[in-house]
Amino acid sequence: QDDIDSLVDEAEQTIFEIARSKKGEGFVPMSSIVPRAFERIEKLFERKEHITGVATGFTDLDHMTAGFQPSDLIILAGRPSMGKTALAMNMVQHAAIVEKMPVAVFSLEMSMDQLALRMLCSIGRVDSQRIRTGRLKKRDWPNLTRATGILSDARIFIDDSAGLSVLEMRAKARRLKSEHDLGLVVIDYLQLMPVSYTHLRAHETKAN
């Protein structure tokens, strides 16, 4: 099964690269690289903005990182039940709703319905305990209705398939990227991802 997944992923990657006609440049001299780097500096200066990547909505964090940059790998770490998923979903909401950016979420623990309920409570400022017990107050309904409209328009794509491998996630993210130009991919959470030791050994062999 690992070999099949690997072959499918490699074939999909090849097709994707052909479709985009993206050819590697190989070695490039500094005389060609430096002008591009300087041009980027000029563009960043002209923007007059501190956030050059994907803003999270957390001001201090955004100022420290200038936003999540393309190819960044960000890991949220903490003890169990400390709010890692809630923090990640707040970042997802900000990126999709405020920044208008397509976001992919691979949820290996919670179902997509559970995540949607969490986000509705967050956006609508409704106590999640009242949602769970069904003891909603009259003032909660307009807030939930407003939150439903906002969340429905957000370009958030959730996959709660259990046991997704790294190869499967990469293939799905690649397809979504080609269709919606993804700006952020979130995985909740890493320890639940199955590890293909055959695939790891193949990478070790290539590295050696």
Residue ranges and their predicted role:
Residues 1-47, 51, 82, 101, ...:
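Short, small/acidic-rich helices and loops at N termini and domain boundaries
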Residues 70-74:
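Pre-Walker A (Motif I) flank of P-loop NTPase domains
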